[in-house]
Amino acid sequence: MSSGGLLLLLGLLTLCAELTPVSSRQRHRDCDKPPDKGNCGSVRRAFYYDTRLKTCKAFPYRGCNGNGNHFKTETLCRCECLVYP
């Protein structure tokens, strides 16, 4: 991984760590919605929260519309959707 990629990853992890602990706040309101691929032409890899498996999973997102249960990275998905006891 390039140094730029490592810096980005470190920044995302730091952001996640600085957020209020997930156990004391509500999960992102769209995390409980089913994944919606959207309807634009270009496909990119995104992540959604799977409520049944209680984890973030990759899926092909078409870049617009859909619902809010899509995140650019697995880390962002985990930060917004995982609730720890």
Curated annotation (Swiss-Prot):
Alphabetical UniProt keywords: Disulfide bond, Neurotoxin, Presynaptic neurotoxin, Secreted, Signal, Toxin
PANTHER family for the chain: BPTI_KUNITZ INHIBITOR DOMAIN-CONTAINING PROTEIN, KUNITZ-TYPE PROTEASE INHIBITOR-RELATED
Disulfide linkage: C31-C81, C40-C64, C56-C77
Domain BPTI/Kunitz inhibitor: 31-81
Similarity section: Belongs to the venom Kunitz-type family.
Tissue specificity comment: Expressed by the venom gland.
Key word Transport present: no
One term of GO molecular function: toxin activity
Record GO cellular component, one term: extracellular space
Protein name, entry field: Kunitz-type serine protease inhibitor homolog beta-bungarotoxin B1 chain
InterPro entries noted in UniProt: Kunitz_BPTI (IPR002223), Kunitz_BPTI_sf (IPR036880), Prtase_inh_Kunz-CS (IPR020901), TFPI/VKTCI-like (IPR050098)
Subunit structure: Heterodimer; disulfide-linked. The A chain has phospholipase A2 activity and the B chain shows homology with the basic protease inhibitors.
General function of this protein: Beta-bungarotoxin is a presynaptic neurotoxin of the venom. The B chain is homologous to venom basic protease inhibitors but has no protease inhibitor activity and is non-toxic.
